[in-house]
């Protein structure tokens, strides 16, 4: 499991598209708050490996490439810890 506080510190870049509290204001960008931790890890690793296509995949591949495995685990832990409704 990742470090929630370390993930929070790294999340500023993510917030530009996915919202400050993990709730996106832009319909084409998914909410990250409340997502399952293992799903987020798998998704980021797939982007990093170039295994996801379509939509915003080129943007996410660029973002994920800059992340270490520890960064991915920490970001996933942070977003999984947030309430899915954006409250709290």
UniProtKB/Swiss-Prot annotation:
The keyword Ion transport does not apply. Its main location: periplasm. GO terms for cellular component: periplasmic space. Binds 1 heme c group covalently per subunit. Heme c binds at residues 14, 17-18, 60. It comes from Marinobacter nauticus (Marinobacter hydrocarbonoclasticus). Electron donor for periplasmic nitrate reductase. Coiled coil: none annotated. Belongs to the cytochrome c family. Homodimer. One of its GO terms (molecular function) is metal ion binding. This is Cytochrome c-552. It comes from the Bacteria. It is found in: Periplasm. Gene3D superfamilies: Cytochrome c-like domain. Keywords: Electron transport, Heme, Iron, Metal-binding, Periplasm, Transport.
